[in-house]
Amino acid sequence: MKKQIGKNLMQKWKNKIRVRLSALDKKKLVLTNIPYILTAFYTNRASFLYRNSLGEDIGNKLLYAMEHADRILTGLQPSFNWRDMLTGIVAAVILKLLVWQKQSDAKKLRKGIEYGSARWGNAEDIKPYMSEDPWMNIPLTATEALTMESRPKQPKYARNKNIVVIGGSGSGKTRFFVKPSVMQMNCSMVITDPKGTLIEECGKMLAKGPPKKDKNGNIMKDKSGKVVHEPYVIKVLNTINFSKSLHYNPFAYIRSEKDILKLVTTIIVNTKGEGEKASEYFWVKAEKLLYTALIAFIWYEGDEEEKNLNTLLDLLNESETREEDETYQNPVDMMFQELEERDPQHFAVRQYKKYKMAAGKTAKSILISCGARLAPFDIAELREIMSYDEMELDKIGDRKTALFLIMSDTDTTFNFVIAMLQSQLFNLLCDKADDEYGGRLPVHVRVIADEFANIGQIPQFDKLIATIRSREISASIILQSQSQLKAMYKDSADTILGNCDTTLFLGGKEKTTLKEMSELLGKETIDLYNTSETRSNQKSFGLNYQKTGKQLMTEDEIAVMDGGKCILQIRGARPFFSDKYDITKHKNYRLLADENEKNRYKVEKELNPQYTPKSEEEVEVIHVELSE
């Protein structure tokens, strides 16, 4: 019995040793022990030579061994005498102990980077993040770019295409970032155009489009040898001059009750109610109930031509209440009563009944706040623009499209329309990618949001920007300072910035931005040289050299940065201090109105086929002779 227990214990120990040996890196084990094996071998040979040396005492033996020391290195046969073997093992063990002692007492020195290892990036640092095909890059600086490929050869260099661009007024956000991105023409683009000039300067180039390529990436040509181009579908929503805008109807993109709730939230967030009560939680919730009920009624029960915000306004105008007569029924009450008789569980009915719990005076206050909130829709031009839809937002990820959102940079009255569109756009494209394309749109969609802080608040944007990457959607947020984003999105601002792998700083003087930029750049280690002079009967001088840490670029250095320079930061890479992108060197610059005024895109003419050109405009006259 005892023998059996002993055998079991031995077997367990053997198994443990076998497991330990299998877990070891055998190659590393051999390489790290080669010095000790060689020490044991040559000490063994030296001991053998000493024992067989001629001489009667230790001194003579040592002299003989030293004279014939070359014999230690020439032979490959170790001595198997126990004395020689023991000497070799002891020497190897002593060496191992000395090395171990040295390593345990070693100082953890970081020579040259004691106070920080920050440095500026170079060509080798940016190379993994750029595509070999220059047309598949997002130009960032004169020397750096970011690949559009979502799955690079080395996954560790994959970065999302969300970009934060920060630059004060006049720093060249449009010229040095937006236009180079547009000139690449490598994806669909949704571009906010605060001045309405970008579409005029780039529209003709987009209408022509980039060269069409086959599956192998080769440029296609027609039978005559001319390059075949792939024109962009150009869409425009202009809230400055409605005559130069296509129509946008948010009702056209409602697919479910969930979309109704999202639309109502967007309207509430980006518009203002009436008086002090408008911002109170109760009144906002009450307004939401009424909007939800009316929009649901229109969407479910209305005719196709009635499904728009104009009908919503008409229903609000008919929703009269009388404080002195709680039993009074307005036309809207009657419509909902009829609907309830047909379908008591109807979504619109359930929302309306909750709203009708309010007393007459309260309901009247709610209606006043609703009317004030939607007051901009009383403008006939805006009502006409939103009467039907021409935007085709759900097709932007199917084909190359350029959607220009023109808004005023001085008046925010109609910016909620832009926010409404962008909110619907993100949700539409995400749903389409998941439902129809297995999670990835066939054409990447870039939202280039110039003057992002003036657009209006997009509900749950902090969550959207974290999830759109996998759907082939990206956002380029363009700001004058980081404080703008924090003012708009409060605590969510840091989450939004954290989901942007790339930051491009074009210049500015806002304190918060300068401080955060300086901290992100980190510290470098520099040599500090001090001199001292003591004056007494005898003068004495002193010199002192030491290391210290310094910000790679201090706040004041960033504030006075050369106007032609910029700072680029990509997650996982060293920061880059580079020249701003020179758009005149881009191959497509010749197609812009900046280069040739003849390339100016006539928005009104393109949107309205019956447009009559002005006397000062150049027109091309084509004579066609028709035979019988």
Task: List the model feature ranges, each with a label.
Residues 79, 114, 128, 132-136, ...:
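Intrinsically disordered, low-complexity N-terminal regions enriched in serine/proline/glycine
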